Amino acid sequence: MDYLDIKGINERKLKVQKQIDKIKEKAERVQNIKIQPTFKHMIKSTDIVKKYIIKHKRKVFGGMAINEAIRKKSKKDTFYTKEDFPDFDFYSPEPITDMVNISNLLVQAGFKNVSAKEAFHPNTYKIKAENYSNEIADISYVWSYIYYKIPTFVINGIHFVSPKYQIMDVYRILTNPMTGWHKIEKQYNRARLLEQFYILPETKQLLKKYKSKILDKRNTFKYVTTLKEKIINDIVENNKDIILVGDYAYNTLIKMSKINSYSKKLIIPDEISLIIKENNYDKFIDSIIKYMKKCKICTNKKKIKITKFSPFLELYDKSARISINGHYVIRIYSTEICLPYQVFDNIKIGTYHLIMLFLYSRKFRSSIAKNYKNNSIYEYMLANLEYARERYFKKKSKIGIERTPFRELQVECMGTEIFTPFHYYVLRKQGVKNRGFEYFPKRGIKTPAEMKKNYFYPNRSGNKEKDEIIINNNETVIKK
């Protein structure tokens, strides 16, 4: 009976449990040799993709790009090894052309059961071969004008997306707790490394740059400022379907951080920026218009303009900006994602990473539009928030997951009915006009021109789609 020492047995098994990761790695090495098709065989397919990417200067993003960026700074902190299957995620202005060409090259090289088709997320595509568990390539469509604006660095002929841009993709995952966290431990580690080696060092330089320089204050009329404040007090406050981001959210966090001379870091809000669930988007826009029509503090003859914009990449969805007499008042962003928030004074404010993601997105959009003034303002805000967060955590002796204004990895998010990417994929497949792209070379080799026929990419340029102008309370309506 002495052998059945329950405590001792449990301690022994705990020691085994600590070795599980190493045992799994050993099993994976054996699997790569024994399971068909073998790792050695399939690695040849990624060589074909790699050569294609180099030849056509496609832009690699994701884990591989982050790993190479980290390698430049610290080889010991890289997370991929030679035993990992190459993970080629790349942006393309012509994904259909690339998929057909790569698929045909794989067939020519002797690979069987090659398939290229649309993935779960809109504007994303994947290539597989021989029923192998890993994708050969994952391709994301980016409109050509924006594509050539994405910053990169080059190693061995491959264009990798730069950390400044890559951090937005990582923050997108950190702010999607319901459907984006299945590999959260990896993504958080990647965010940490990018911040350590790139974001924080740059923040230090920016803080020096703006230390003695006060940004030009935005000009605004008193009645416009009062109107914004009234919208926040009368409509935004206590509204469970709205999350504030942008200027007002930035000012809230800066105030709560209590950093030295924090009042000097506050900015004059350009407009109210908020995010609302997609099913309430149109109704909310109508309610804002009705409210502004009744504005008693505005000038007698009001010109209210609603400018609608397409989604911008995967960074934010469709939006509408409402202005009065040429002055911005509010911009409303739609979302289908359950986004995390915190509540201050009965107003939902985006979490730290959600606000940072929004500011990075707007900064990139400003750089594309060559709006250098706004680009500098967003740069200034990002640096201040980064500094405010770290100073707050250090002063309060927090690690970051506690309930504070700068809390990370918050699970609570806006929305009650959440649908997965697979749900939206099924809806797209059921659509009449576009059932999704699919190409199977074994059914007959096709050219890119044949496969692109009648296929249209969704518009995610972030460009203006139309204006609706209401003059003097419905006196005239003009649509452009």
Give the residues covered by each predicted segment.
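C-terminal, non-catalytic extensions of nucleic-acid polymerases
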Residues: 2-17, 21, 30-31, 203, ...
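Active-site nucleotide-donor binding segment shared across nucleotidyl transfer reactions
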Residues: 42-96, 100, 227-282
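Residue-level detection of beta-strand-connecting loop/turn positions
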Residues: 1-8, 131-133, 157, 326-327
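Helical scaffold of the NTase/Pol beta-like nucleotidyltransferase catalytic core
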Residues: 1-68, 178-252, 464, 471-480
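Conserved catalytic core of two-metal-ion nucleotidyltransferases
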Residues: 104-148, 291-340
